[in-house]
């Protein structure tokens, strides 16, 4: 069989177009003018035919410098005739503007075509027309109509239906021997239910001159894009952590089985997306502090508490069954999660069931297939978990044995028959059940047209499987966090190590690629937590507790000479804490004398002090105050932290003699100590440094990583782009078609106090609040003056704002958000229920999930009613469904 590939691409000198995917090595095309490229290949095809997949790329001196968009690869079915010739006319594929429609969120759930048409009939002399039309749901199909009898003679009712076997690409093969040229045609949106044409495409007639085909030759015309004049697709969804779900059979915490019940409610209320928080294992000490879902010990393993024990099996011991039944009722009746009791009880169940069923399950074909596919991460995770409990610490550096990961030693421990194996294989068993359960929930959601949206944390724990097995990928001498923002005036210190991007780049970001690809098994959309981390990360020194002493990595620090070019004379004192008698009373009040006596020492007679040895870093101060949480101790501790961070510049961690202006220092005493000329000079360099200097640099950093990572799967990509946002972020997200996050009370336009919903970009996710924020009702009561301005200026109401957010007000705000321009409006469970006085939680304070400024937040929020009650809440469900329908977020085509 002969394949003739043809593509138009304007190259520069030294560049060549090549085909990849057909053979282990890419195949060069040839050109005479640097524009039109061709290649002719001979291929053996089995008699039953075969499908080939391929893509184009540009190489220079043997190096790939550009690839076309290949998330949805080119696919052609070849018949089995050895004498057949295929002439394939392609166009270069850039990332589509409507990339979201090609994501698995749409092709597998929202606009899925579960019953695909057969591969089109084949002809000796054929004309294959292929076109991309992703915005078509299962009740419609693409049809073709033209100036031929075989194409209906422009009668839309006689249009020929195309095959969706490779949806969202459509195709048809025409008998070229019966066609008259020139051929003219257009595409039609056809209603399969009503068996009639719905509308014509918006383009002019498409035209094809006589291709002069030979016998046994088929011409393939590919890469046509079809657009119809129909409304842009919009949908609504719910955001709720899995742990917060509550059914009548839950075991004190939401589980993967409960996800199916949430899907039922989403369908009942016309919602299309369920967004959850990370579900990875976070077990460090088995205490409630492990409840933080972003501090996982594995980027692959799921948290055992999410196992639905009903699906795992039934214990034969009747007494044990009775005991667990009683415990289930007790834990499930609690208004909030008792993390320790829930996990302890579930682990008792796991151990009993494993003794009863483990051997049989581990011998099953299903488990063996799962193990072979996942052993690369499953074995280290299981051993890590076993050793963590055996040595009573997740800090592997303190383990007496295996503190340094050796793959050979771990492999020996995992061999059946060893003393360690029963303890290790228990984790295999649990992870296998979790895999089956989440996969089942995912498939259930897809079947019902609902998307499960996951969450990828930006960081990993420094006491995790990955830090143990792959330490070369991380900078373990720093802490990731975030600069000061609306969430925390002192910045956030997450404690995670930062990534060694230079090492990751060398193997093509394999670590990240595997992570994304694993996630794609269970999710069709995901949120990149803190997407800014792919541009730069806020890195905090290990000696700091707060985030104020951090610096961006990578970054372009300033030299003394550059600092002084702004008019500020650089002094070494700017690197040291500025501590002066004049403001100590403001910081410490009645504790001032104690602080001066115990923690400070005088420098000279001018009133200057320095920290005493032993208290020069925030970590040293933290150590002193461990366990002292009374009001006075907290006051003194936080004041000492403030003194230590009261510096004007921070030294660069890599380059000696280079510096960073300290973030947010204008609020601190050291800045106030400058004269007006110095303040103005500092503000000029500060503005240049934080808002202009790095734009192009960080753009390039992001474009090294994000294109191949976001295109490594077909999941819909959403970025959490909140906080201190460089100007380059929106450019990158737009170039890569990543959905942004829009929150009205955190507007991206600094001129606005509240975001303008009608100005949100279409490629965005709109929400009222996130898990890191107070709910709508909670926010309404936080700052009455701000609420009043929102009530008058944004909602357009006259008079005095109510002191609480009434159901009517909440419904108005929800409706406004549903009417926004965003493709997705995903609201928290709490904000959805706020619109109904009967069903919303009477206690607003119980609805808060996380307070970012509190590093010891207990993540224990639960629904205040069960999913069964929710399904029966007809007035609420009807109201939500009607709101979604009448705001255009339940499209029928």
Regions found by a protein language model. Give the residues of each.
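Aromatic-rich carbohydrate-binding modules that target alpha-glucans
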Residues: 2-51, 59-80, 133-181, 190-213, ...
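An acidic-aromatic pocket/loop used at catalytic or ligand-binding sites
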Residues: 5, 93, 99
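Intrinsic disorder/low-complexity segments in short proteins, especially the signal peptide
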Residues: 8, 90-93, 224
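Intrinsically disordered, low-complexity regions enriched in Ser/Pro/Gly/Gln/His and often acidic
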Residues: 29-30, 62, 85, 161-163, ...
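C2-type phospholipid-binding modules
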Residues: 79-88
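Catalytic cores of glycan-processing enzymes that make or break glycosidic bonds
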Residues: 98-124, 128, 175-178, 209-893
